Amino acid sequence: MVGFTEIGLAAAMGALATIAGAFEDAESDVGSQSNPNSQVQLAPQMMNFHRYFNKAISGEPVSYMLYGAIAGTVTWVMMTKFGLPFLAAAAVGVGVNALIHMVFATTAHLGRMASAAEFGHPIYLDVVLSHLGPIAGFGGIATFAIVSLAYIQWALLKHPFPLPLLAALWGVTVGAIGSSTGDVHYGAERLYQHYPFGGGVPVAAHGNITRKAETGIRNSMDSVYFCAKFGNPLTGLCFGLVVFFSTWAGLFGQWGAVIAMGLVTLGCLIVSNRVEKKARESYGTYEDVEMDEICDPV
């Protein structure tokens, strides 16, 4: 019989996964990482200079596998070799990883921006300094949640894999979900806001990203402010539901998990349909426009 302890662990893992997914996507938005990054990288070649932070050397799954492995390894060493409790050990592991994270972010951004010097693009040092804090902060929260997930599996559920390996695997998973779920709202929704609603991103517009903010010139902090309203929570919800319902298979059997996931999927489809219909009724259908009718993003 399933007890309250097992249900509590499943709920805790789902909550931690939700936090990890939301803040992982927020961190990638601050740093212009993963799919939309190609548009930020292409912009200087199209003579569209910008103030976005641009740090993607690898995709989110690979980078968060590294961050999870680093934080998980340091946490495991602090617990097994120095006898620290989990929270203290995790704080040390996340702190060490945050320092490495900022080093990688800095070198990646400076390297990419330096490569754009051929097109006359400058390096804005204030952009580097102002974005490193949120990158380390959001990444630290996501990494702490990842390590906590791994700890629950390793220490409480007695998973045969060691904690560092579990943290690395969770890092790959949350990075993949953040890349596939959250990037839409940073890419087509935010980088191309000066184009008509619902038109997508035509090939001819690649690199012609939005550079004006509500006030002044846009940077990546504006992007995460926008994505925190919908894209980040949606990513967290996606990862949280995946983890939560995957634990249901062990708690309530295969069919219990299938039925629960089916009901949630049906509910999401209904909500998505209602939201899209309301958006179309509010903003109208997409109409073709001439390029000279589109506002200048400079």
Curated annotation (Swiss-Prot):
Q: Name one GO cellular component term.
A: cytoplasm
List residues traversing the bilayer: 3-23, 59-79, 84-104, 132-152, 160-180, 230-250, 251-271
Does the keyword section mention Methyltransferase? yes
User: What domain of life does the UniProt record list for this protein's source?
Assistant: Archaea
Pathway listed for it? Answer: One-carbon metabolism; methanogenesis from CO(2); methyl-coenzyme M from 5,10-methylene-5,6,7,8-tetrahydromethanopterin: step 2/2
Q: Which UniProt keywords apply?
A: Cell membrane, Membrane, Methanogenesis, Methyltransferase, One-carbon metabolism, Transferase, Translocase, Transmembrane, Transmembrane helix
Q: Give any single GO term for biological process.
A: one-carbon metabolic process
Listed InterPro entries: MeTrfase_E
Q: Which N-terminal residues, if any, form the signal peptide?
A: none
Substrates-to-products reaction catalysed: 5-methyl-5,6,7,8-tetrahydromethanopterin + coenzyme M + 2 Na(+)(in) = 5,6,7,8-tetrahydromethanopterin + methyl-coenzyme M + 2 Na(+)(out)
Its biological purpose is as follows:
Part of a complex that catalyzes the formation of methyl-coenzyme M and tetrahydromethanopterin from coenzyme M and methyl-tetrahydromethanopterin. This is an energy-conserving, sodium-ion translocating step.
- NCBIfam families, alphabetized: mtrE
Subunit structure of this chain's protein: The complex is composed of 8 subunits; MtrA, MtrB, MtrC, MtrD, MtrE, MtrF, MtrG and MtrH.
Q: What is this protein called?
A: Tetrahydromethanopterin S-methyltransferase subunit E
Write down the species. Methanopyrus kandleri (strain AV19 / DSM 6324 / JCM 9639 / NBRC 100938)
Quick one: which gene encodes this?
Answer: mtrE
